[in-house]
Amino acid sequence: GALNIFDMSYLISGTAMLGLLIYAFPEFKGFVFHKNQVILSVAVCIIIAYVLGMISWIAGKQFRCWIMKRFENKSKDDYLNSTFEDTAKHFVFKNETITKLMADSKSVAYSYMWMRLDKSQSEDCRNRFVYISRFWVLRAIYEGLILPVMFLSVTVFLRCYPVWNDLGEAFIQWIGGLCGFTIHPIFGKILVGLLFALIISIIAGIFIKLLIDEAKKCIDTQVREVIVAYYHFYEEDNTHQDIT
C-alpha cells in the first residue's frame, strides 16, 4: 500500500502535534477542516499529520541523541556498538562477510543483517522481521512524541498563566497580610511565573525522560533481535540461506 508500518509512527506523533496546534491556534482549524468536504478534510489531515510527524520524529531523535551525548557521553553509534557487542559476543559467526563487517564497523554489520532479514523469502524469517520492525515503529513513536510534549508544556504555560497569576497574586496578598509585609506586584508575578514554569518543566521533563528511556529500550531490543534472528536464519539454520 501507499503507507506501511513505518509510516504509522509518523501519523501517530503527527496527529498528536496537529491536535495541539489546533488547541493552541483555534483559527488553524479552519485550514484543516473544510465544511461539507469530508474527503478533502481527511486528505489534508493525513498530509499535515504525516509532515508534522516526520518533523517531530527528527526533532525528538536529535534531542534524544543530544541528551545521551550530554549526560551519558555516548553518541548514537556508541550506543548501538555497545548493544551490538554485548549481544554478538554470545554467538560464533562463521560467515566471512559478516565477520569482516563486524570487525570493521558494527553499524555497517547491523545494517547488513537488517537488509538480509528484509530480503529473505523465508516465511519464518519474514514473520520475525515484521516483529522486529515493530520496535523501530515504537521507538519512532516515542521519539516523535517528545516535541509534542514540549509544545504542550509551552502552550499550557501561556494559556493557563492568567489563572495561575490571579491565584498567585491572591496568595501573595494573603501571605503579606499574614506576615505583615508587602511584596511588589511585579516581583509577585515574576515569582508566580517562575514557580508555574518550574512545575510545568518538571512534569514535562518526567514525561520526556520516560519517552527517551522507552526509545532506548526499543533500540536495545531491536538490535538484539536483529542479531539473534540473523544468526538463527543465516548462521545456525543453513536451510534458510538457500531460499534467500
Describe the predicted segments one by one.
Residues 55-74, 160-166, 208-225:
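Juxtamembrane/interface segments at transmembrane-helix termini
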Residues 15-20, 153, 198-207:
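Hydrophobic core of alpha-helical transmembrane segments in multi-pass integral membrane proteins
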Residues 1-3, 174-182, 186-190, 205-244:
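Cytosolic/matrix-facing juxtamembrane and C-terminal tails of multi-pass cellular membrane proteins
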Residues 1-12, 119-166, 192-197:
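Transmembrane alpha-helical segments and their cytosolic interface motifs
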Residues 62-130:
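Charge-rich cytosolic interhelical loops and cytosolic tails of multi-pass membrane proteins
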Residues 32-48, 155-203:
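Hydrophobic alpha-helical transmembrane segments
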Residues 11-75, 175, 179:
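Long, highly hydrophobic alpha-helical transmembrane signal-anchor segments
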